[in-house]
């Protein structure tokens, strides 16, 4: 009997056994993912897609497919992010890998990527898989550079930071809207608006990490400092006075000491870096609103909804969109 003849029956038996006990196996495999899904979130991406659909008007069933794809990818990336960042809290509770272990959590995250891919044929457009692949590559490119800068202790420029964010954070926003555009009769390209929204989202997230009490409750105080991350205010602060190595030295320590982190936050404040964040966010908000207002033919209701979401992504209110 040839090796192929030996392998084929065994594979068939395993597949049949998997189906027979599928529900139990599925629960085990997905446990780290399901734990994360059960944690209360703000569903910002889902709200954004619903808002964009006032313009794109795609069928509800296809919108739900795209929402599932983005939800799976987003949560898969969070599972991996928490491992790569050595995080301890997610949405105020222990991270998945603290409960299920690193190996099982990585497997669940990878499984979620393929669950998302499995949804693509339901969109009935051969271009959808290309969009899916392009934006997942972008996401990993951005994440790769973020990790590299952190681990090599290299402070990027703001331009390099924005390129990374456009790939890492903007990737899922773009994926959602690009898939929606494939299913829409509208020929308008909303990607430029989505790109600006991705920047708003990440700059705000970086700001809140060091300034928000709500963020402290959900993720821990100054988590970016403990991680050693070159976030937007940290980049500005370091580059505002390159001869002062205090902040860059603190980042290398991966400190959990609250007093040291408070010292770092005070230093970042002293270099005007939080004010720089606020000004940058205001400029990005103005860009996004200008793009929206320049779209002819859209109803005032649609503009109102989008402006509300832009406000949610900005500094107004206490929303923490992670």
UniProtKB/Swiss-Prot annotation:
CDD domains noted in UniProt: Trans_IPPS_HT (cd00685)
Encoding gene (name): dpchD
Protein name: Geranylgeranyl pyrophosphate synthase dpchD
Biological processes per GO annotation: alcohol biosynthetic process; mycotoxin biosynthetic process; terpenoid biosynthetic process
EC number: 2.5.1.-, 2.5.1.1, 2.5.1.29, 2.5.1.10
Binding site for Mg(2+) 3: 205
Cofactor binding, per record: Binds 3 Mg(2+) ions per subunit.
Pfam families hit by this protein: polyprenyl_synt (PF00348)
Binding site for Mg(2+) 2: 81, 85
Organism whose genome encodes this protein: Colletotrichum higginsianum (strain IMI 349063) (Crucifer anthracnose fungus)
């Amino acid at each position: 009997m040839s090796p192929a003849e030996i392998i084929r029956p065994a594979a068939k038996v395993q597949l049949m056994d998997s189906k027979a006990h599928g529900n139990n196996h599925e629960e085990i495999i997905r446990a780290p993912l399901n734990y994360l899904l059960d944690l209360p979130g703000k569903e910002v991406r889902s709200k954004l897609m619903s808002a964009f659909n006032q313009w794109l008007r795609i069928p509800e069933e296809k919108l739900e497919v795209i929402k599932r794809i983005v939800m799976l990818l987003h949560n898969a990336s969070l599972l991996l992010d928490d491992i790569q960042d050595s995080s301890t809290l997610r949405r105020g509770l222990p991270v998945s890998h603290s409960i299920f272990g690193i190996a099982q959590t990585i497997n669940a995250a990878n499984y979620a990527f393929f669950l998302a891919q499995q949804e693509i044929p339901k969109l009935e457009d051969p271009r959808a898989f290309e969009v899916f692949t392009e934006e997942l590559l972008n996401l990993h490119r951005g994440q790769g550079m973020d990790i590299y800068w952190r681990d090599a202790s290299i402070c990027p420029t703001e331009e390099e930071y924005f390129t990374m964010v456009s790939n890492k954070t903007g990737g899922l926003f773009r994926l959602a809207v690009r898939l929606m555009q494939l299913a829409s009769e509208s020929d308008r390209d909303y990607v430029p608006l989505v790109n600006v929204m991705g920047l708003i989202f990440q700059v705000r997230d970086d700001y809140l990490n060091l300034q928000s009490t709500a963020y402290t409750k959900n993720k821990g105080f100054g988590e970016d400092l403990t991680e050693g991350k070159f976030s937007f205010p940290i980049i500005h602060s370091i580059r505002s006075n390159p001869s002062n190595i205090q902040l860059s030295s603190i980042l290398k320590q991966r400190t959990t000491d609250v007093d040291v982190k408070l010292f770092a936050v005070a230093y970042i404040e002293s270099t005007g870096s939080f004010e720089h964040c606020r000004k940058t966010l205001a400029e990005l908000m103005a860009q996004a609103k200008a793009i929206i207002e320049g779209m002819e033919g859209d109803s005032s209701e649609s503009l109102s909804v989008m402006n509300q979401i832009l406000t949610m992504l900005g500094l107004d209110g206490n929303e923490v969109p992670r």
